Amino acid sequence: MTQTFADQKRKTVETAEFTEDGRYKRKVRSFVLRTGRLSEFQKNMMNDNWGTLGLDYQTEPFDFAKIYGNDNPVVLEIGFGMGKSLVDMAFANPDKNYLGIEVHTPGVGACIAYAVEKGGTNLRVICHDATEILRDSIADGALGGLQLFFPDPWHKAKHHKRRIVQPHFVAQVVQKLAGNGFIHMATDWENYAEQMLEVLSANTDLVNTSKNGDYIPRPDFRPLTKFEARGHRLGHGVWDLYFVKK
């Protein structure tokens, strides 16, 4: 049976940690590969539009000026889910370039479909482990900002080590940010918000924009996500953090 590009992309993500040279092998992962069904529509969207909207992992830094056709700042979003808020932000901010990373192929397919519907040329998506993209495919100082909205909270204490927001992750992101680049995080888990605040505040290259030294009100430019709406329904608060590189 012939595999389509979308099938191969899913296979690549699912087997990445088992390659013979060990390059993709990681002991602790911040995500779980969900096995949701990739619909025929999503598959077709990926197959038909990957050449214009998709980027593949590579071992040398992306040439963003060539990819986007301009020198506008690049905002990276990790874990965009189904991609609606990412596409909406890209459409609302044509003066910025957006790069989204998601390992869940149905989400990638849905994001591409919505991007095609909305139009615009300032969005690209990647279906790969974000830590490897940061490590190998993005040059130091190349990003205008990082967005991390409602990452997996790994709410059990024994799983907190799996949370993506750790000192080494933040240090890696800061290295990739240009001067005055931002890190914007949001979560509906108070314990995770506290960890985010602690880790971000401990990095001496970052400045908290909160007047109180903790969280900021939800900014108008961040679209309401389904995770945030779920949090409201469950009676959870939502915490936004916005730090800037010195």
Curated annotation (Swiss-Prot):
EC number: 2.1.1.33
Keywords from the UniProt entry: Methyltransferase, S-adenosyl-L-methionine, Transferase, tRNA processing
Annotated catalysed reactions: guanosine(46) in tRNA + S-adenosyl-L-methionine = N(7)-methylguanosine(46) in tRNA + S-adenosyl-L-homocysteine
Protein name: tRNA (guanine-N(7)-)-methyltransferase
Protein species of origin: Haemophilus influenzae (strain PittEE)
Record's keyword annotation contains tRNA processing: yes
Residues at which S-adenosyl-L-methionine binds: 77, 102, 129, 152
Active site per the UniProt annotation: 152
Keyword Metal-binding set for record: no
GO terms assigned for molecular function: tRNA (guanine(46)-N7)-methyltransferase activity
Its biological purpose: Catalyzes the formation of N(7)-methylguanine at position 46 (m7G46) in tRNA.
Family: Belongs to the class I-like SAM-binding methyltransferase superfamily. TrmB family.
Binding site for substrate: 156, 188, 225-228
GO cellular component terms attached to this protein's record: tRNA methyltransferase complex
Pathway(s) annotated for this protein in UniProt: tRNA modification; N(7)-methylguanine-tRNA biosynthesis
